[in-house]
Amino acid sequence: MPAQTVGAAETAGQGVTINVYNWGEYIANGTDGSLDINAEFTRRTGIRVNYTTFDSNEALYSKLVGGGADYDIIIPSDYMVSRLIHENMLAELDFSNIPNYQYIDDSFRNADYDPENRFSVPYTWGVVGLFYNTDYIEEEITSWSSLWDDRYAGKILMFDNPRDSFAIAQLLLGQSLNTVEESDWLEAAALLKQQKPLVQAYVMDRIFDKMESEEAWIAPYYSGDAAILVDNSDNIRFVVPKEGTNYFVDAMCIPATSSHKAEAEAYINFLCDPEIAGANMDYVGYSTPETAAKAYMDPEMVESPVHYPDEEILARTQVFVNLPENTGKLIDKLWAEAKMGGPGESAVLVAIILGFLAVYIAILVYKRRKRKRELA
């Protein structure tokens, strides 16, 4: 059946503007000879796109719960989709407006994060790995422990979000990425605190730029973005460490507060057109959940083990799930401490501040008493 790119909902929505909130560098935009996806959608449907970006699932969640923004399309990762469903923050999709959903592979349907397949449509998938510069790191990297190697001090980057950073420590410790045991999270946090002095920066989208400019030598990153740099560099290598990694799916969803649900569904349908999906994935570098889209993609990308890891690698992956609220609060607390170097450092800082304050108060008291004596 041919793809359907213009439907009744799209035609009815001409003149409407939808607000799309997506990850940075996560859609073809007309640069480097790519198709401008949003412009093409507007050309075909008359529906305009106001497109803004975020750099972590947690930033997306904070923006949604904080209010003040009316989004029609968001693209969270699997575990965040589950959380948003649980908190009644997503609209149920009308799949009669998304006929191109037929092209989504069966293996991506009825996923654990959306078991009834009511609230999301897969956009991309990938894995997390390590990429490093072979001009500065000559030995072959095989383990996440390389991010704790003091030979690379000041040249190591880490994710600036808790789930991804904790996952690296958890994999080294042999833990489940979805443990709810407080002792596990404390152990992982201790490992991250040990790493802190070696880390140049905690960043997200800037990982790519820092690695490209050789400001950093080694960093964890998502396979799609890493693949772009690997494909365009002779000295950048990407590896999935032996301890395993996180496998993720990012999915298109509509917030329950959307003002233009039918037009948003038209946008999802457009992105599911195999030809559009192929052109899009060619640019963003991530893996498509549509086998049909591969016919429109660069054959080298389709055959690349970075873009499409083999079964041996996939067998060593874990998928994030939404964690209980109390575990989430613990993670946030431990993450803040880990980035500061732990409560030990913050306690020293507090002690110093209190010490200065005590001296300042003592001086004020002394001056006041001295003045009283002089007046007497």
Name each model feature, range by range.
Residues 10-83:
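Early extracytoplasmic/lumenal segment of secretory-pathway proteins
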Residues 65, 69-73, 91-130, 155-157:
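A structural signal for short loop-to-beta-strand junctions that line the ligand-binding cleft
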Residues 85-92, 114-118, 228-240, 301-305:
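Ligand-binding "clamshell"
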Residues 91-102, 120, 234-246, 255-258:
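Short beta-strand->loop
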Residues 146-162:
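Short loop->beta-strand "edge-of-pocket" segments that line small-molecule binding or catalytic clefts
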Residues 157-161, 165, 169, 177-241:
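Ligand-binding pocket segment of bilobal, Venus flytrap-like solute-binding proteins
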Residues 255-316, 360:
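Mature extracytoplasmic/periplasmic domains
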Residues 311-376:
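Conserved C-terminal helix/tail region of periplasmic/extracytoplasmic solute-binding proteins
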